[in-house]
Amino acid sequence: TKETVVEQIANLSQVSIVPNCDEYAIEYLPLSELFDTIKGKSKYTKKYGNLHSGPYPVYSASSQGTLTHLDTYDYDGRYMTWSTNGFAGTILILDGKFSINGDRGILVPKNGRQDLDFDYMKFTLEPIFRELAKGRKGDNGEDEFTKLYPSMLNDIMVPIPVDGEGNISLSLQKEIAQKFISVQNSQKEIIEKLDALISKKISI
């Protein structure tokens, strides 16, 4: 039935499919050795944007667009960022000249290191971040409004593929990331086909 297909789409959208990476040698390193975690500036609001209007985007908790635009920027380049409030733990890769407000944090590679692939890191870290945010419980045992501040990331150990000499391998990270992307694309393709069936009102 149509309802069954809709339910299947909803379920499939929530599934995190992880490719088999058993063939790789993995080391676990502290997140704090790989990245500096920095929270955005709370002064960046829509009102602030109206007073300092310009071409450079400011990103907030939402991954669906910008909060405002300023005449200055705090970062220039490609970075991983995460939402600290609301749908906390969701990672968004940003590229260009931009700023973030207090509802988003940024992961800056430690000492300018160049051996980290952001696609691999996003696929690896996002489930860990989301679980950390989801794990917070209120006094009554109910989930609180999720938050994920930099201080909450201190104890994370990151699984990273290493080469035969035990060094972090950028090429293996890229190889694994491509597997993630391939699986994700297949998942997206299935969902689109199911959506098409519904829109055509085909009886199943």
Which ranges hold each PLM region?
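Non-catalytic DNA-recognition/assembly elements of restriction-modification systems
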Residues: 1-64, 163-204
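Short loop/beta submotifs within extracellular cysteine-rich repeat domains
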Residues: 129-133, 185-186
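Long, hydrophobic alpha-helical segments that serve as membrane-spanning/inserting helices
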Residues: 30, 34, 133-134, 142-143
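A residue-level signal for beta-strand positions that form part of recognition/binding surfaces
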Residues: 28, 55-56, 79, 104, ...
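Generic recognition of flexible, low-complexity loop/linker segments
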Residues: 44-47, 68-70, 144
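A short glycine-rich beta-alpha junction/loop motif
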Residues: 15, 98-105, 137-165, 170-171
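Short alpha-helix boundary/capping segments
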Residues: 109-120, 145-148, 165-168, 182
